[in-house]
Swiss-Prot record:
Summary of the function given for this chain in its UniProt record: Microtubule inner protein (MIP) part of the dynein-decorated doublet microtubules (DMTs) in cilia axoneme, which is required for motile cilia beating. Located at the center of the tektin bundle where may function to recruit tektins or stabilize the bundle.
GO cellular component: axonemal A tubule inner sheath; axonemal microtubule; sperm flagellum
Protein source organism: Macaca fascicularis
Oligomer and partners: Microtubule inner protein component of sperm flagellar doublet microtubules.
Location within or outside the cell: Cytoplasm, Cytoskeleton, Cilium axoneme; Cytoplasm, Cytoskeleton, Flagellum axoneme
Name this polypeptide is given: Tektin bundle-interacting protein 1
Length: 209
């Protein structure tokens, strides 16, 4: 009891009871530097910088939030206009790292590499305006052999012209494979060989119902 009274009469608070490390304020331009290899996998995945190579973590890049900046062009979701701007440091490092590999890769793989590196999970995939934007860049589909596109990816709430699969563009309804219709009740239950386009001969024994 005497100990508690002496501690209560002290004019100061013991440092052991105070929180010494405070988190960064929400509306602040202070940048935190953490050592990458010590991060847990989940934190390292969540705090990966925006303009970085796929599978790498950028270090020492300024990432403006756009909340306290007077110039909105410096925000993290906008691309700077000047290529020599210091805010493009990580992008220039990414482009220099993958420029040699892009020349040796097919165009489809280069397209996929840029998609995954520039993907912004904060912005949704569909928009209510015809101009599709992927991240902060205007996106235009290019026909790449072997890659499937959604025909109404830039049309929010627009139904396709036919009631069939809408993930293979420019393919008429009769030419569609039997398993691509949206209504599973319309799928054929007979086995079908896509390579020969033949169906098995009807068996003589009736099938039980």
């Amino acid at each position: 009891m005497q100990t508690l009274r002496r501690e209560a009469a002290r004019p100061y608070v013991p440092s052991g009871t105070l929180e010494a490390s405070f988190p960064a304020p929400l509306y602040s331009d202070d940048y935190l530097s953490l050592e990458g290899p010590r991060w847990p996998l989940v934190i390292r995945q969540a705090t990966r910088w925006k303009y970085t190579p796929m599978g790498r973590d950028a270090a020492g890049q300024l990432w403006y939030t756009g909340l306290t900046n007077s110039d909105t062009r410096e925000a993290w979701y906008n691309l700077p206009l000047d290529p020599a701007s210091p805010f493009r440091e990580a992008y220039n490092r990414w482009h220099g790292c993958y420029q040699r590999r892009e020349h040796t890769m097919p165009s489809a793989y280069t397209q996929h590499l840029r998609e995954t590196a520039w993907h912004d999970p904060i912005i949704p995939a569909q928009y209510q305006v015809p101009s599709t934007r992927w991240g902060s860049t205007l996106w235009k589909d290019r026909p790449i052999r072997g890659k499937e596109y959604v025909i109404n990816r830039n049309r929010y709430g627009v139904e396709p012209l036919w009631r069939a699969s809408d993930y293979v563009p420019s393919l008429s309804a009769p030419q569609r494979p039997p398993g691509t219709t949206q209504n599973y009740r319309e799928w054929g239950l007979e086995p079908y060989c896509p390579s020969t386009c033949q169906r098995p001969l009807p068996s003589s024994t009736p099938m039980p119902r």
